[in-house]
């Protein structure tokens, strides 16, 4: 046993991978015997890593959750109207590099809204062409990328050197920045900026609590909201809400929606450096209710512990589970009719109140997160088949077939998959 408030208790380290005194992770698992052999430098390197708050101290490439920011910048500076259409053929060339969309076969013609819903890299890069480097960098600063948020927690990371500037941003860097790759940010930077996109454009300094009270309940300090700036106009904010609502109803974020509620948001999948390792950060950034955002939520999964990492479902599932508990607790009432599956899932098939009928969006393939459609459980299961094998077969069952080759098409990368072996016979994704 150990006191969670005692940040220097070595027993908190039991079971984690040991770091050396320079903070590099080793393969050794910490036991009491290992703790007994640690010198002070190694011990404190491990304790500091254990209590580090990922949300404010760790940086990462945010990936496609940055796409609403790009669209908002284009709308706000007048380079986009929202009525544009773009053709995605699977890739574009910038600065001598071929940069791919998540769907190498291309998404075809897309509106601005559809580009956000399908998370199309190629469409976003074309928007970046219209926005231009100078405008993009102006809004990068408005969104507080590269700057501290000054949240009232210790250890917020400095990111000034982790974003591009006018001297370092070329056409390839601008292209990849439009979909959240090539620069680093913290979670608190991203969610604070996103809140401004969906609350009418108002950027507030983030705080952990709204007041401090004594043990007898006396208020010691009130922490009032502090408005710092306006990032976008109310009209731009309304459009971003509309686009992000579509991500959940029609696009890549369907699995984030809690039963009975309408929400909005954006999925993210970013390939980590070095790219050849195929490690990913997957995420979902969202809000509720969909028509009048009051709650923001952001889930980031750093290198999911699974064979196939580039699946936003790992993050959308977290968001769905959290909001399923949080929204009723905060007295938000269901607004959407429950399907039979949702009634069963909530364990309230006999108790759920039937709401006025609304049109439920049909299930569709997740263009970014390789969303796996739910299937009815069969009465018989093959005992020798592992859970990972079952999940992989279910995922393959959702893939479309290439009419020319007969191979399956992986929706995230456009790679061709041999249905007999499950192995790729084509290239793999560049970034998403």
Give short role names for the model-derived ranges:
Residues 1-64, 69-301:
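Beta-lactam-recognizing serine transpeptidase/beta-lactamase-like catalytic domain environment
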């Amino acid at each position: 046993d150990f006191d969670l408030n005692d940040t220097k208790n070595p027993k908190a380290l039991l079971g984690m991978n040991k770091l050396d005194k320079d903070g590099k992770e080793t393969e050794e698992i910490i036991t009491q015997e290992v703790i007994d052999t640690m010198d002070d430098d190694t011990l404190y390197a491990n304790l500091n890593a254990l209590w580090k708050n990922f949300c404010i101290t760790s940086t990462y490439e945010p990936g496609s959750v940055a796409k609403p920011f790009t669209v908002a910048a284009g709308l706000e500076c007048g380079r986009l109207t929202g009525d544009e259409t773009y053709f995605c053929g699977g890739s574009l060339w910038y600065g001598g590099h071929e940069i791919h969309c998540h769907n190498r076969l291309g998404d075809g013609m897309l509106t601005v809204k559809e580009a956000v819903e399908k998370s199309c890299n190629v469409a976003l890069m074309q928007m970046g062409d219209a926005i231009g480097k100078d405008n993009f960098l102006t809004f990068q600063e408005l969104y507080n990328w590269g700057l501290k948020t000054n949240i009232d927690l210790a250890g917020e990371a400095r990111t000034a050197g982790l974003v591009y500037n006018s001297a370092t941003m070329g056409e390839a860097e601008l292209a990849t920045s439009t979909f959240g790759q090539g620069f680093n940010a913290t979670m608190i930077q991203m969610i604070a900026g996103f809140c401004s996109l969906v609350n009418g454009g108002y950027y507030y300094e983030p705080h952990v609590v709204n007041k401090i009270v004594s043990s007898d309940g006396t208020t010691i300090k009130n922490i009032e909201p502090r408005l710092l700036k306006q990032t976008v106009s109310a009209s731009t904010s309304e459009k971003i809400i509309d686009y992000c609502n579509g991500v959940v109803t029609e696009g890549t974020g369907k699995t984030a929606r809690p039963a009975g509620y309408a929400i909005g948001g954006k999925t993210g999948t970013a390939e980590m450096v070095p790219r050849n390792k195929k490690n990913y950060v997957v995420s979902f950034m969202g809000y509720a209710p969909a028509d009048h955002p009051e709650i923001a939520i952001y889930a980031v999964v750093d290198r999911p512990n699974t064979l196939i990492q580039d699946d936003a479902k790992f993050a959308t599932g977290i968001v769905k589970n959290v909001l399923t508990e949080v929204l009723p607790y905060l007295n938000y009432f269901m607004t959407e009719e429950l399907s039979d599956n949702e009634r069963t899932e909530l364990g309230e098939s006999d108790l759920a109140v039937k709401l006025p009928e609304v049109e439920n969006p049909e299930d569709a393939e997740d263009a970014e997160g390789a969303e796996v459609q739910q299937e009815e459980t069969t009465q018989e299961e093959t005992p020798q088949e592992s859970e990972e094998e079952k999940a992989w077969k279910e995922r393959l069952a959702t893939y479309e077939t290439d009419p020319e080759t007969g191979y399956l098409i992986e929706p995230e990368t456009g790679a061709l998959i041999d249905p007999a072996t499950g192995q790729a016979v084509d290239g793999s994704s560049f970034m998403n």
